[in-house]
Amino acid sequence: MKKTIISTLVIGLVSGCSNTNLLKDNLASEQSVINLSKSSNEAKSRNIEFLSGAYLSERKVPKHDIKFSGKYVEFESKSPIELIDVLDGLSKQYNIQYVFSDELEDENSEENKKSSGSSSAKKIKYSGPLAGFFDYLSSAYNMHFEFGHNNLVKAYHYKNQVFNLQQYFDDNKFSSSMQIGGTSGTSSGLKGTADTAIESNSWEKIDEFLSASLGETGKFTIFEDYSLVTVKARPDKFLLLHTFFDKLINESKMQIAVDYRVVSLSEERLNQLAAKFGIENAGKYSITSDMVDAISLSQVGGGLGASYRSASARLDAVVNELSQEVMHEGHFIGIPNRVMPLNVTTNSKYISSIETTKDTNTDEETRTVKVSDLVTGFSMMVMPKILDDGRIQISSGFSRKQLVSIGTAQGITLPTVDENESMNTVTMNPGEVRLAMLFKDNYIQNSNGVQLLGGGTENKKSARYIAVLVGASSYKTNDLASNRVNIYD
């Protein structure tokens, strides 16, 4: 056989085999190696499976393994009967084997007295497919049925299920604090203290929900490190569980882009804009969300076109028309119910006290100088939430501290600072722009002062308005792992 192959190759070369034919042979050889490698990889990958849902432990038996799936049943009881009597009838008629695989715990508990079970008698009336009859019995008796091979039906008082949330929740405990600001208050679920902070922890929410929902006999375990939740409860509890987890999963697949601008403008500018857009009460005017809407719609209509749904584009349009100075701007991207923090601060040192100590024996004086920190700048926290109707609710905290002037007295530094802090909640449609907060800023500047957030250094008292504008958009992420891949086809 070897001789034949070698001889054939020699003949091919002598007869002037072209380079093209040699190239084809090489390609065919390479393709053969590639196909062999693919087959080897597929054989090694048969233990890998991408899940289409969050539920690991619910095993579905293929239809061809349920030999009675195509049969029809009519069942009607003239008086209430227990589940065991129903299963006895099915066993005789359709040769179905059944077994009760667990027992009802604490049968005398208030929960189990109110709930159905295998010992509860019910009036039964059903006509339809035999496989669907078990769904009917599950609802009537609050039982869970699993179908095995050889026509075996297992009846459970409790259902066990593992919820896998790994692809939806990572390390999802988030906290944020404002590095500046000292006023206190509480608004919209935000916690305001001397160290203003927001914290979000989905696992705590899941724990609270399960504790309140599973009843006296329900049990659950949360494995945060593996993002798994195991639940054992009566079957009627799982509809609520599925609704709850599906909502969390759907929210975690959403991403929210939040844009913000902190702008300043004068009272004169406000009056001009009020007159331009026909807004009344210009003499005592302060900016309103109506003006923001009017500017936004006007600018969009003026040619933004495809950018209509872009919150960033609409926000820029509002800022260009409205503001005299952009103090801060930023862009957050995250998922719902997660804190998005921003701290832009400057830490300065100043002499806060001088202590003099005199030695009575030597008349020598010792001076101790104490230096303190002064943090100025800007802090912001944003926590977005997607409502059931698709709108976006943004809870935000804003804190700003600026150094107005510095004086001295007997060697001690006397800084004058201006603080503003606010917490609020705004609700908007995706792509819209809203006024998050507004405050009037009166400040005094002198030649020795230091003005941190804009402005000059003239010796006069000035007034301006500081506005925080927020825009948000939401979109659904493409999660390849959520698509089921059947590697056996």
Curated annotation (Swiss-Prot):
CC per GO annotation: plasma membrane
Lipid-conjugated positions (S-diacylglycerol cysteine): 17
Topology of this chain in the membrane: Lipid-anchor
Location within or outside the cell: Cell membrane
Keyword Hydrolase: no
Residues spanning the membrane: 174-190, 294-308, 402-417, 442-457
Leader peptide range in chain numbering: 1-16
Key words of the record: Cell membrane, Lipoprotein, Membrane, Palmitate, Signal, Transmembrane, Transmembrane helix
Residue positions of covalent lipid attachment, annotated as N-palmitoyl cysteine: 17
Function: Involved in TCP pilus biogenesis.
Name listed for the protein in its UniProt record: Toxin coregulated pilus biosynthesis outer membrane protein C
Species of the source: Vibrio cholerae serotype O1 (strain ATCC 39315 / El Tor Inaba N16961)
